[in-house]
């Protein structure tokens, strides 16, 4: 049975009829059937895989791992996220139906870990890409800590009002080597800036106005010449 308390759901009449609200009923059904999408890239994922065994038995929480983001409402990121993998992670998150949740598992996912000290290709925190609901520190976290994070997420869902959830702004993201992310307008317009065909010696010399400035379309013949 679910041990999470609902203020309205606990009131019953003499005939054992439960009086509740649609919002509490929706929260109860969602927290009892979380379907996670496992996004594991490092050793933290091995710790999460041990939860599937009989020792921890995470099926008692209603967790059913899914391989498709369209069938999942929880994504669990475990391991290092590189700049090259960032667009794929954002695409998976945007394909998940609302409401959706994120658990960041491990130091590499939360802050970049030891790989972020001298690596230009490591994302220093997955929350720069997608909104995170629960942070789970550790290197790697134990399976008991993962269960505790899932319990905290279930408590958060129990107190949730769906209309108050802040839906993240959808748009194309631009990120640079200094790990600054920006929402920009669509770049898939077929228009290209000729000034970017011959980049300077340092990418830091390109201003933001120049990078997102659009001119008339350039034909393939002009590009060759």
From Swiss-Prot:
It comes from the Eukaryota. GO terms for cellular component: chloroplast thylakoid membrane; respiratory chain complex I. It is a peripheral membrane protein. The keyword Lyase does not apply. One of its GO terms (biological process) is aerobic respiration. Its cofactor is [4Fe-4S] cluster. Binds 1 [4Fe-4S] cluster. It catalyses: a plastoquinone + NADH + (n+1) H(+)(in) = a plastoquinol + NAD(+) + n H(+)(out); a plastoquinone + NADPH + (n+1) H(+)(in) = a plastoquinol + NADP(+) + n H(+)(out). Its EC number is 7.1.1.-. It is found in: Plastid, Chloroplast thylakoid membrane. [4Fe-4S] cluster binds at residues 43-44, 108, 139. Keywords: 4Fe-4S, Chloroplast, Iron, Iron-sulfur, Membrane, Metal-binding, NAD, NADP, Plastid, Plastoquinone, Quinone, Thylakoid, Translocase, Transport. It is an enzyme of class 7 (translocase). One of its GO terms (molecular function) is iron ion binding. It holds the Pfam family Oxidored_q6. InterPro entries: NADH_UbQ_OxRdtase-like_20kDa, NADH_UQ_OxRdtase_20Kd_su. SUPFAM superfamilies: HydA/Nqo6-like. Belongs to the complex I 20 kDa subunit family. PANTHER family: NADH DEHYDROGENASE, NADH DEHYDROGENASE [UBIQUINONE] IRON-SULFUR PROTEIN 7, MITOCHONDRIAL. NDH is composed of at least 16 different subunits, 5 of which are encoded in the nucleus. NCBIfam families: nuoB_fam, PRK06411.1. NDH shuttles electrons from NAD(P)H:plastoquinone, via FMN and iron-sulfur (Fe-S) centers, to quinones in the photosynthetic chain and possibly in a chloroplast respiratory chain. The immediate electron acceptor for the enzyme in this species is believed to be plastoquinone. Couples the redox reaction to proton translocation, and thus conserves the redox energy in a proton gradient. This is NAD(P)H-quinone oxidoreductase subunit K, chloroplastic.
